């Protein structure tokens, strides 16, 4: 027993083993990303900042069915519908989302029959004041216009699983 301990101490086997382990990890590719400059690929199902979409002809998609308002567990969505138009359809006059209350569950997106409200790919929407987290219809439509290409691609990629 003493001879075994003396050999370990003399040849520094534990030190050499630890050194070799360190060298193995030293030369492997780094798993850490330099975030602002490097980003992980996002899933098509990523739930980020909300957006209201428009049809390709420019007409907004929301038909004021209020399913998203009804299903929201945080009660973060407020909708007011305008009067029926000549063709029998409705559109919203007010569409507000309180992003402070929102829990990003995605129920609003799943409930929408026309894919009007979606949670887009944007994860970087920090603000300086709490009031900026109250999104009105104009802000949501602006988000939809900004992210429409990626949103449409993500919906198409996710279509087989819906």
From Swiss-Prot:
Q: Where in the cell is it found?
A: Cell inner membrane
State the InterPro entries in the record.
Answer: 4Fe4S_Fe-S-bd, 4Fe4S_Fe_S_CS, NADH_quinone_OxRdtase_chainI
Molecular-function annotations in GO:
4 iron, 4 sulfur cluster binding; iron ion binding; NADH:ubiquinone reductase (non-electrogenic) activity; quinone binding
Q: Which GO terms describe its cellular component?
A: plasma membrane
* Keyword Membrane carried by entry: yes
Annotated 4Fe-4S ferredoxin-type domain ranges read 52-82, 93-122
Instruction: Give the UniProt keywords, A-Z.
Output: 4Fe-4S, Cell inner membrane, Cell membrane, Iron, Iron-sulfur, Membrane, Metal-binding, NAD, Quinone, Repeat, Translocase, Ubiquinone
Superkingdom, taxonomy of origin: Bacteria
Classify the main location.
membrane
Membrane-topology descriptor? Peripheral membrane protein
Note accompanying the cofactor annotation:
Binds 2 [4Fe-4S] clusters per subunit.
Q: What is its EC number?
A: 7.1.1.-
Per the UniProt entry, what are the Gene Ontology biological process annotations, in alphabetical order?
aerobic respiration
Query: Which cofactors are named for this entry?
Result: [4Fe-4S] cluster
Name the enzyme group at the top EC level: translocase
Which sites bind [4Fe-4S] cluster 1?
Answer: 62, 65, 68, 112
The portions of this protein that span the membrane are none
Q: Which residues bind [4Fe-4S] cluster 2?
A: 72, 102, 105, 108
Please list the reactions this protein catalyses. Answer: a quinone + NADH + 5 H(+)(in) = a quinol + NAD(+) + 4 H(+)(out)
Which NCBIfam families does this chain map to? NuoI, PRK05888.1-4, PRK05888.1-5
Q: How does it assemble?
A: NDH-1 is composed of 14 different subunits. Subunits NuoA, H, J, K, L, M, N constitute the membrane sector of the complex.
Family indicated by similarity: Belongs to the complex I 23 kDa subunit family.
- Describe the function of this protein: NDH-1 shuttles electrons from NADH, via FMN and iron-sulfur (Fe-S) centers, to quinones in the respiratory chain. The immediate electron acceptor for the enzyme in this species is believed to be ubiquinone. Couples the redox reaction to proton translocation (for every two electrons transferred, four hydrogen ions are translocated across the cytoplasmic membrane), and thus conserves the redox energy in a proton gradient.
The protein here is known as NADH-quinone oxidoreductase subunit I
Which organism is this entry from?
Methylocella silvestris (strain DSM 15510 / CIP 108128 / LMG 27833 / NCIMB 13906 / BL2)
**What's the name of its gene?**
nuoI
């Amino acid at each position: 027993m003493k001879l075994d301990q003396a050999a370990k101490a003399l040849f520094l086997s534990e030190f050499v083993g630890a050194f070799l382990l360190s060298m193995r990890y030293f030369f492997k590719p780094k798993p850490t990303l330099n975030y602002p400059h490097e980003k992980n690929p996002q899933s098509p199902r990523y739930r980020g900042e909300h957006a209201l979409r428009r049809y390709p002809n420019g007409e907004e998609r929301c038909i004021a069915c209020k399913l998203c308002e009804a299903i929201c567990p945080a009660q973060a969505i407020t909708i007011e519908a305008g009067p029926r138009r000549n063709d029998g359809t409705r559109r919203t006059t007010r569409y507000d989302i309180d992003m402070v209350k929102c829990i990003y569950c995605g129920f609003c997106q799943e409930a929408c029959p026309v894919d009007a409200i979606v949670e887009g790919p944007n994860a970087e929407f920090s603000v300086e004041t709490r009031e900026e987290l109250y999104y009105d219809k104009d802000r949501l439509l602006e988000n939809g216009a900004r992210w429409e290409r990626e949103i449409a691609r993500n919906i198409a990629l996710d279509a087989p699983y819906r």
